[in-house]
From Swiss-Prot:
Gene of this entry: Gar1
GO molecular function: box H/ACA snoRNA binding; snoRNA binding; telomerase RNA binding
InterPro entries assigned: Gar1/Naf1_Cbf5-bd_sf, H/ACA_rnp_Gar1/Naf1, Transl_B-barrel_sf
Region ranges (RGG-box 1): 4-68
Protein localization: Nucleus, Nucleolus; Nucleus, Cajal body
Protein name per UniProt: H/ACA ribonucleoprotein complex subunit 1
Sequence similarity: Belongs to the GAR1 family.
Any Pfam family matching the protein: Gar1
Annotated organism of origin: Mus musculus (Mouse)
Region feature (Disordered): 1-75, 167-231
UniProt-listed Gene3D superfamilies: Probable tRNA pseudouridine synthase domain (2.40.10.230)
Keywords: Isopeptide bond, Nucleus, Repeat, Ribonucleoprotein, Ribosome biogenesis, RNA-binding, rRNA processing, Ubl conjugation
Subunit structure: Part of the H/ACA small nucleolar ribonucleoprotein (H/ACA snoRNP) complex, which contains NHP2/NOLA2, GAR1/NOLA1, NOP10/NOLA3, and DKC1/NOLA4, which is presumed to be the catalytic subunit. The complex contains a stable core formed by binding of one or two NOP10-DKC1 heterodimers to NHP2; GAR1 subsequently binds to this core via DKC1. The complex binds a box H/ACA small nucleolar RNA (snoRNA), which may target the specific site of modification within the RNA substrate. The complex also interacts with TERC, which contains a 3'-terminal domain related to the box H/ACA snoRNAs.
Free-text function comment from the UniProt entry: Required for ribosome biogenesis and telomere maintenance. Part of the H/ACA small nucleolar ribonucleoprotein (H/ACA snoRNP) complex, which catalyzes pseudouridylation of rRNA. This involves the isomerization of uridine such that the ribose is subsequently attached to C5, instead of the normal N1. Each rRNA can contain up to 100 pseudouridine ('psi') residues, which may serve to stabilize the conformation of rRNAs. May also be required for correct processing or intranuclear trafficking of TERC, the RNA component of the telomerase reverse transcriptase (TERT) holoenzyme.
Length: 231
């Protein structure tokens, strides 16, 4: 599951249909990186884990496309909302919030953000920080001002616009992933054609980490944690 750019079914930058990533490892990459486990969102270690920025049909990335998770159409407030986070400080015309979701669930990029009364204040713009202690920024709606919010004011989200953190963590030892070169199915081998799995790299994933383990978030806009399209 990677984001930014992408052909049909692709998960990360550039890439043909069904391809997973431009740089590294087996399955679910974030964007770029060295080898090894651990993980970070946008950058960092190799393969497994999951990824944000990407594009193409079926992907999570920034551009539109079918089957993606971002660029949500405004369909009015959801039936119910759950706690997403707390206001920390303004940043130019945006606001920065600490994520306080249950079980550290990760919001989709571009997912609408609400007050408790379901009034929309903006959309999730960036995610950054450590895997289990992260923040997000909100790009405010035109009628909202960053200076109008108080410290620790709570914000809410549609529960269907959250993903479990486990989606971005390395697999437990001994757990097998999909066959090499599989993933998107269809033609192609390593690095890119249809169904390709990407070259090099180990398992890992993560948010914006450095090489190998550890890791933090640093995601961009997009669906599903994810820089991308409509759900």
């Amino acid at each position: 599951m990677s984001f930014r750019g992408g052909g049909r079914g692709g998960f990360n930058r550039g890439g043909g249909g069904g391809g997973f990533n431009r740089g590294g490892g087996s399955n679910n990459h974030f964007r770029g990186g060295g080898g090894g486990g651990g993980g970070s969102f946008r950058g960092g270690g190799g393969g497994g884990g999951g990824s944000f920025r990407g594009g193409g049909r079926g992907g999570f990335g920034r551009g539109g496309g079918r089957g993606g998770f971002n660029k949500f159409q405004d369909q009015g407030p959801p039936e119910r909302v759950v706690l997403l986070g707390e206001f920390m400080h303004p940043c130019e015309d945006d606001i920065v919030c600490k994520c306080t979701t249950e079980e550290n669930k990760v919001p989709y990029f571009n997912a609408p953000v609400y007050l408790e009364n379901k009034e929309q204040v903006g959309k999730v713009d960036e995610i950054f920080g450590q895997l289990r202690d992260f923040y997000f920024s909100v790009k405010l709606s035109e009628n909202m001002k960053a200076s109008s919010f108080k410290k620790l004011q709570k914000f809410y989200i549609d529960p269907y616009k959250l993903l479990p953190l486990q989606r971005f963590l390395p697999r437990p030892p001994g757990e097998k992933g999909p066959p090499r070169g599989g993933g998107g199915g269809g033609r192609g081998g390593r690095g890119g054609g249809r169904g390709g799995g990407g070259r090099g790299g180990g398992r890992g994933g993560g948010f914006r980490g450095g090489r190998g383990g550890g890791g933090g978030f640093r995601g961009g806009r997009g669906g599903g944690g994810f820089r991308g399209r409509g759900h």
